[in-house]
């Protein structure tokens, strides 16, 4: 897959802000970031309020996703350009959602907000609304999603890639250092998992490293590209970034994101856990 199939540059984005069939969507960890300013014409998706089921711990389902996108003015024919802060980590999470519900016309803005702001490109404070559409999401593509039982059965068999920080992997922390240390009941990592922090795939300006650099990163860490691969983090957003790198940029086959991640696994009774590096 060519990079142009899944990524757009900031130059391209700025030249296509007014294109009728393109919808720019911002998705941030800090869901108030968009409210301060955003790329002109972009709409907002709140990863917690919009993409998570309000009752059970799971994604919104096919009907809910259809309603969400229809209400926000996105049609099945639109090309969606996702971007956000912190090297696009939650934008990559949303990208994986779109792929889960088989919306193929979706790309990431390489570098996200960070690159856009470093370039000094314009931002807007205008309120953006789009006319509602009748969006029809497809049934989820669970070939890109890993579930608990498959993960447990994959220990010492498939590639398990823990993309959290070394301190989370070793069990010193339960969550990134800037966040509350909560959600999972136990620290540590899944036995046989390789620790390759997600952020190593990005340059200082938030753009993705070259294919050659990325291939070397994962090969040097011992990842066997001939095996099936499951990536995980704490809640699935950082592992979505690595899923994007492995599948969409490097062309790995059979890569799944375990969105339950450590929040689920670290709270299970009786499953194997390892501490240390």
From Swiss-Prot:
Q: Which residues form a coiled coil?
A: none
Q: List positions binding substrate.
A: 238
Database matches in InterPro entries: Rhodanese-like_dom, Rhodanese-like_dom_sf, Thiosulfate_sulfurtransferase, Thiosulphate_STrfase_CS
This protein's species is: Mycobacterium leprae (strain TN)
Q: Which domain of life is it from?
A: Bacteria
The record's annotation in Pfam families points to: Rhodanese (PF00581)
This protein's name: Putative thiosulfate sulfurtransferase
Q: Which reaction does it catalyse?
A: thiosulfate + hydrogen cyanide = thiocyanate + sulfite + 2 H(+)
Q: Which gene encodes it?
A: cysA
Which lineage is the organism of this entry classified under, starting from the top rank?
A: Bacteria, Bacillati, Actinomycetota, Actinomycetes, Mycobacteriales
Enzyme Commission no: 2.8.1.1
Q: What are the record keywords, sorted?
A: Repeat, Transferase
The catalytic residues are 233 (cysteine persulfide intermediate)
């Amino acid at each position: 897959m060519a990079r142009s199939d899944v990524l757009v540059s900031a130059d391209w984005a700025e030249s296509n802000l007014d294109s009728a069939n393109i919808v720019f969507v911002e998705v941030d960890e800090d869901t108030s970031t968009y409210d301060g300013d955003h790329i002109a014409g972009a709409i907002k998706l709140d990863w917690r309020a919009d993409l998570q089921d309000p009752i059970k711990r799971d994604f919104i389902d096919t009907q809910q996703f259809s309603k969400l996108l229809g209400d926000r003015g996105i049609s099945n024919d639109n090309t969606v350009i996702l971007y956000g802060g912190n090297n696009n980590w939650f934008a990559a999470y949303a990208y994986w959602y779109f792929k889960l519900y088989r919306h193929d016309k979706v790309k990431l803005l390489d570098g996200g907000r960070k690159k856009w702001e470093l370039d000094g490109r314009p931002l807007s404070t205008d309120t953006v609304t789009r006319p509602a559409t009748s969006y029809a999401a497809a049934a989820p593509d669970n070939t890109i999603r890993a579930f608990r039982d498959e993960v447990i059965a994959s220990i010492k068999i498939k590639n398990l890639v823990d993309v959290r920080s070394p301190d989370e992997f070793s069990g010193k922390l339960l969550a990134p250092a800037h966040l509350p240390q909560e959600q999972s009941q136990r620290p540590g990592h899944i036995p046989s998992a390789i620790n390759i922090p997600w952020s190593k795939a990005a340059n200082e300006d938030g753009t993705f490293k070259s294919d050659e650099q990325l291939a070397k990163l994962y090969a040097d860490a011992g990842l066997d590209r001939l095996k099936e691969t499951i990536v995980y983090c704490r809640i699935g957003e950082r592992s979505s970034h690595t899923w994007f790198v492995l599948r969409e940029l490097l062309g790995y086959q059979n890569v799944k994101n375990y969105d339950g991640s450590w929040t689920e696994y670290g709270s299970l009774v009786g499953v194997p856990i390892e501490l240390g590096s």
